[in-house]
Amino acid sequence: MAFDPTALGPSAEPYLRDVSPGRIWHPLFRHECAFGPDVFEDVMMNLIKNPNINSSWLFRADILHDTDPAWSPSPPPPTSDHPDQQGAVAAVQDVRHEEQHQPIPVAFQDFRNDRVLVRRLIPRNTRRDDPLEQTCVFASSSPGKDADAAASKTRSLVVYLPHASEPDALPFYHPKVRGVAQLHEWDAARAVGTLSIHYLFFDDADFAVEKLVRTARMLLSVLYKHGQGRVRGYTKRVHHDVVIPQARFQNRYAELKLKYARDLVENWAETTDPSKHVFEDLGIAAFLIELWADMYRGQEFPGFVDIGCGNGLLVYILLEEGYSGWGFDARARKSWAKYNKVRDGKDSLQRLVLLPDAVSRPSHEDGREPALDLSQIHNGAFPKGTFIVSNHADELTPWTPILAAQSGSPFIMIPCCSHNLGGHKYRAPPPRDKTKSPSTYSCLVDWAARIAEDCGWVVETEMLRIPSTRNTAMLGRRRTRDAEEVGIDGVLAKYGGTGGYFESAAKLTRTEKGH
């Protein structure tokens, strides 16, 4: 059933009776639905926790108060390590759990309040918009045993009340109304339901404001779409925030964006789109910083290496944030002139070609190997514990868990283009999970995960919140067995061998052709 709601004009009789005098909730749209109260409440809770579904201006919602006995406040996110940045991101990071976030009282005739929450809406850009606290109320009304046909429906209601006393106090991303109510009515005998959306206006004349009416229609359409999707058996395939909580990642990302984004975009030296690459690398940096905070709490950071580092921006950001490390790529980039740092006499960005010791050497009839410039070769052996970063490293992606096993190093790999261990373009076999798409990217991700597992790694997967469709990150930080028990030669043979890699590496040491 396509979404085609019935518009209800200003003269429509209210469906809801607020017990407070003078508070009139005007219905705007109504639509039939095929899902019951449980689905309605589940969808609404998801929308409360994830307001970014309704508005791209929003990051998330932090739950500050909840009458559910099972709820407990989340720990406050870590504060900035940079005092000069604390003021700029205070609006995002200032979650004071010792404060009392009192909900706005509301009650409706014939309804009982089942659950009351207070959420803080966190905008993407705190320079443009302020966070907003909002009371969210779940209420319900069940038919009595002797109810007539008109009153035989189960009614479920979710109400949003912004903590603002006047329209000008509301940020851009929130409709300028005193309250929003979404009502679900369910006729169990006929298995038919209806949805409707209602506004509590600051001024009843606001019913004529087209933007408010358009927003109401959009909110109802999202609720309808998600509810109907549950009926059709939709299950969420992508799960974010498995490794790092959403609030921590987004707070760190907001901090980095405020600190670096404008300068990086305005002074972009490459021909590629800065709006994509800058925010993508800021997101990856934010994830790594929070990951490392967990992994190395109370320990000295062991350093990182970014293999196939490309333009070097990720290395630059991490160094600026105080992490020791370096990166290399087969081809230097224009950006390196700005991003490179010299520490202890060594460049942070180096032109090197990866040639692992495990790569088979070709045999020639005359007994000679292709000439190598050894000064431009790295054998893939790193100091034990060095964190290996492999971000869209293409030919180096399948080598990442192998090098990590040999060096005793944890890693992150974010695959992009599919290549085999010989460095050639390659279509990996279909994923083991037959419910997943057999796309080239899904095949690559599963194939790389298989290699990692065969190298003895427990593979953790996180769908990064970055502006890229190639956003699957795989982590290796725990092992199923010691590296000595892994037969690397057997792994290489199982996944097609390394034929052609040596010759390609030899050419790269003599040319500027990159990955």
Stretches found by the model and what they are:
Residues 299-310:
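Conserved class I S-adenosyl-L-methionine
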